[in-house]
């Protein structure tokens, strides 16, 4: 099985989408300073720019496609100029197709500069946040928007706080297992279509649902189940980090399966290696409980560096090498 498909990436986001959504995910409130067509302006990069040199007249390397931040330094510079000089300096911004301008620390633009931005179709916003915090929050939001992502067939469940991705051929019962885990008190992130993102250069993968399918599940023989309506808000999760992948396999008596758990397998998703557990399916096997144990084993290894197979192996080695014991003692 391979999940290392080439990641997709947004080319741009509209300024309208940015304005309408950043406040939902981050502690930053933007207020409009003018009225222009926000749908027409697009943001192409996650990085921001403070246009101090551009305002001073040096525009050779002006990264105008980035969102522009005007903080205390930039606004004070403009304010200390005469009216004509101020207009000339601000024209170094408005003659480019800048996505939008954000004024931090509740700074203001002179009315004539605001009119210039409006005439150029540049949205202008203001926030009470400092430049440092605003840059951090806006960059984090855009990092999410421009992150690598891919859609996978499977189910994503939060088991004891561990994000477990269930994969395998269609018809093996991934949705039924996910539903059983929800009934046992765990949380459903997504079923059937799982959207996985890798943020920036981090080694973290986050999984979320497809917005159309939402938290609905299709159970063969039963039909569509609304997990949120049936089990309540405690049964769903919006986003969860992918920490373990469980691949469900059809039972094959000719195949050799892992028995001790000493060999750690991994699978690559969007360039990140994730622990992999392969579970054969056959009648009478309680997969739900086994997946709970998979999650608990992961927590034991992460926080206590404890692996049951290694502990048992060490114990047997100590007994075998103990000269004071007899072969009979070993079997007792």
Swiss-Prot record:
InterPro entries: HPr(Ser)_kin/Pase, Hpr_kin/Pase_C, Hpr_kin/Pase_Hpr_N, P-loop_NTPase, Ser_kin/Pase_Hpr-like_N_sf. Coiled coil: none annotated. Its cofactor is Mg(2+). Residues 217-226 are annotated as: Important for the catalytic mechanism of both phosphorylation and dephosphorylation. One of its GO terms (biological process) is regulation of carbohydrate metabolic process. Residues 280-285 are annotated as: Important for the catalytic mechanism of dephosphorylation. It catalyses: [HPr protein]-L-serine + ATP = [HPr protein]-O-phospho-L-serine + ADP + H(+); [HPr protein]-O-phospho-L-serine + phosphate + H(+) = [HPr protein]-L-serine + diphosphate. GO terms for molecular function: ATP binding; magnesium ion binding; phosphorelay sensor kinase activity; protein serine/threonine kinase activity; protein serine/threonine/tyrosine kinase activity. It comes from the Bacteria. Its EC number is 2.7.11.-, 2.7.4.-. ATP binds at residues 168-175. The active site is at residues 153, 174, 192, 259. Homohexamer. Both phosphorylation and phosphorolysis are carried out by the same active site and suggest a common mechanism for both reactions. The Walker A ATP-binding motif also binds Pi and PPi. Belongs to the HPrK/P family. This is HPr kinase/phosphorylase.
């Amino acid at each position: 099985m391979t999940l290392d498909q080439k990641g997709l990436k947004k080319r741009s986001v509209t300024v309208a989408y940015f304005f309408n959504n950043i406040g939902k995910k981050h502690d930053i409130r933007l207020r409009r300073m003018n009225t222009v067509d926000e749908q027409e302006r697009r943001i192409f990069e996650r990085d921001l720019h403070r246009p101090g040199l551009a305002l001073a007249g040096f525009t050779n390397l002006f990264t105008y496609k980035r969102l522009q931040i005007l903080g205390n330094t930039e606004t004070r510079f403009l304010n200390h100029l005469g009216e004509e000089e101020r207009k000339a300096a601000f024209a170094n911004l408005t003659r480019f197709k800048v996505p939008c301008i954000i004024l931090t620390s509740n700074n203001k633009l002179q009315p004539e500069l605001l009119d210039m931005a409006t005439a150029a179709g540049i949205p202008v916003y203001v926030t009470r946040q400092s430049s440092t915090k605003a840059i951090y929050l806006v960059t984090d939001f855009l990092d999410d928007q421009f992150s690598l992502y891919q859609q996978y067939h499977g189910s994503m469940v939060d088991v004891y706080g561990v994000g477990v991705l269930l994969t395998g051929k269609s018809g093996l019962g991934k949705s039924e297992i996910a539903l059983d885990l929800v009934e046992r008190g765990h949380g459903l992130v997504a079923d059937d279509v799982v959207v996985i993102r890798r943020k920036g250069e981090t080694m973290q993968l986050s999984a979320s649902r497809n917005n159309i399918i939402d938290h609905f599940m299709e159970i063969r023989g039963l039909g569509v189940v609304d997990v949120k309506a049936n089990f309540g808000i405690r049964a769903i999760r919006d986003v969860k980090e992918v920490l373990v992948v469980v691949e469900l396999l059809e039972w094959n008596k000719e195949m050799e399966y892992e028995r001790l758990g000493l060999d750690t397998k991994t699978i690559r998703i969007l360039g990140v290696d994730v622990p992999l557990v392969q579970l054969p399916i056959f009648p009478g096997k309680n997969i739900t409980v086994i997946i709970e144990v998979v999650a608990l084993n992961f927590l034991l290894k992460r926080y206590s560096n404890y692996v049951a197979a290694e502990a048992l192996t060490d114990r047997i080695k100590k007994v075998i090498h103990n000269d004071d014991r007899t072969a009979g003692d070993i079997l007792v």
